Amino acid sequence: MIRVVQFLNQIQAGLGGDERMDIESRPEQGAVGMGMLLRTMLMRKGADIVGTVICGDHYFLENREEAVAKLTELIRPFRADVVICGPALNHKRFGECCGYLAEALENREKIPAFAAMAKESTGTELFRNRVYIIETPKVGGTGLNASLKRIADFAVKKSKGEPIGSSEEEGYFKRD
């Protein structure tokens, strides 16, 4: 089984909205919140969300290096084959958090990781040339199931170290 860890913010984890943006990094066993939908698609491909790491947007961005270090520390015990950062949809601050964490995991820790967010997220332009970002709809937009399927497919491919196809084939934002 492919071991997946997902990174979510307080909203996607179901812990509250903007009033909970100060939540510090914490782990959860298995899938939570938005991850419950994604887990179904991953399981069809021989993968499962073994853990979720959560951090509030405000806390992450105000303490970026500390948050990245703590989240990395929390991810290690799950022995992840791949880390999915998001989906952030069009939550601007969360998109940036996803980009920073995916970049650190890939470059510093050599853990396969990628992000998922809508084109409207500020994280998309900041990170599209630095990490793979699977395109998702914005909140309330159509196509969430299709994007979750692309996320699951990409996670499996990334975990196996398989060659990554074009942005059109894989569903990530084109890199310059």
Task: List where the protein language model places each region.
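An N-terminal assembly and electron-transfer interface module characteristic of large anaerobic redox
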Residues: M1-D176
